[in-house]
Amino acid sequence: MEVKVGIGDYAVAKKTGIISTYGLGSCVGITLYDRLNRVGGLLHALLPESARYGGRGNPAKYVDTGLELLIKDMMKLGASPRRLEAKLFGGAHMFTNVSNENLMVGKKNVEVAKRELKKRGIRLVAEDTGGKGGRTIYLDVSTGKVRMRKVSNGKVIEAVF
């Protein structure tokens, strides 16, 4: 069974299934996995920090508050925060004519994701971020492996992390 995660959303599962998200541009997709209990989760965050944007609306649309929700729901399925491993995708620079640091949302999303993972003691074990193209990712909850598909310079690139 495949669960599709939209922008500003997340999903968790235990032992089986695929959790996917499509069209990661400047957004980031963060997968977390507890190998021992085979609990996985995926967050598709739109913006870096809730406080910076007034904290309005859905907390899952922000990296910092969305990650917190994801971890809490994974713990309900038996995951241990000490055993979580993270993989990070997305954070592309989608607008080539933008050079203002404040408008480089993709770069900021990646920076905040790394900071928040480190703050929580979660090891980042794989990453495919930046660039100019969108990505689609599929987390296999039975193994923790993430299949990524992206288009770069007109070529489709697939990789497993």
Swiss-Prot record:
Give the UniProt keywords, A-Z.
Chemotaxis, Hydrolase
Listed under GO biological process in this entry are: chemotaxis
The signal peptide, as residue positions, is: none
Pfam families referenced in this protein's UniProt entry, alphabetically: CheD
What's the catalysed reaction?
L-glutaminyl-[protein] + H2O = L-glutamyl-[protein] + NH4(+)
EC annotation?
Answer: 3.5.1.44
* Disulfide bridge map: none
Could you cite one Gene Ontology molecular function of this protein? protein-glutamine glutaminase activity
Coiled-coil segments: none
Q: Which HAMAP family match?
A: CheD
Q: What does this protein do?
A: Probably deamidates glutamine residues to glutamate on methyl-accepting chemotaxis receptors (MCPs), playing an important role in chemotaxis.
Q: Which family does the record assign? A: Belongs to the CheD family.
- Protein name as catalogued: Probable chemoreceptor glutamine deamidase CheD
Organism, scientific name: Thermococcus kodakarensis (strain ATCC BAA-918 / JCM 12380 / KOD1)
